[in-house]
Regions:
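ABC family nucleotide-binding domain
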Residues: 1-173
Length: 175
């Protein structure tokens, strides 16, 4: 599903990733562990092309995506969900609207279908009563679960999580 070959990423003189090779098969769960600043987030951002690798290639389902144009990158990101370390929820939208916005705007679902999906996902992450709240009214752990629900609403083929449990209560990590 994902094949990384000789991936390197530098920011100026600082080489953050050096000659990374990894194959991730469909259904496989991979955990990247390392100290703060070791390049874990940069690696994830390279996988979904939010960061352009300095060198190397990334293949997604056999297709080299490294040189994708803007349109191709946007299509790829629809297939590859990402939950960010800092959640990136829209503060001026309700929780339900945060979850339904992208699937409706991209034409993947009708508004009614997206609402139903949002309700199912809110139930799944244990926050069915938060649909009409705004992000500022939620705890860090609740925001993180909403970010997970929002990403799942796109029905991605692959999920990338950047520090997925950093704000979660230990009793909720099984979700």
């Amino acid at each position: 599903m994902i094949d990384v070959k000789h991936l390197s990423k530098s920011f100026g003189e600082v080489e953050v990733l050096k000659d990374i090779n990894e194959t991730i098969d469909k259904g496989e769960k991979v955990v990247i562990v390392g100290p703060s600043g070791s390049g874990k987030s940069t690696f994830l951002r390279c996988l979904n092309l939010m960061e352009k690798p300095t060198s190397g290639d990334i293949f997604f389902e056999g297709e080299n995506i490294t040189q994708a144009n803007e349109h191709e990158m946007n299509k790829l990101r629809q297939r590859m969900g990402m939950v960010f370390q800092h959640f990136n929820l829209f503060p001026h939208l309700t929780i339900k609207k945060n979850i339904t916005l992208a699937p409706v705007k991209l034409g993947l679902m009708t508004a009614d279908e997206a609402d139903k999906k949002a309700e199912e996902l809110l139930e799944r992450v244990g926050l069915p009563d938060k649909a009409d709240e705004y992000p500022s009214r939620l705890s860090g752990g609740q925001k993180q679960r909403i970010a997970i629900a929002r990403s799942l609403a796109m029905n991605p083929e692959v999920m990338l999580f950047d520090e997925p449990t950093s704000a979660l209560d230990l009793s909720l990590i099984h979700i």
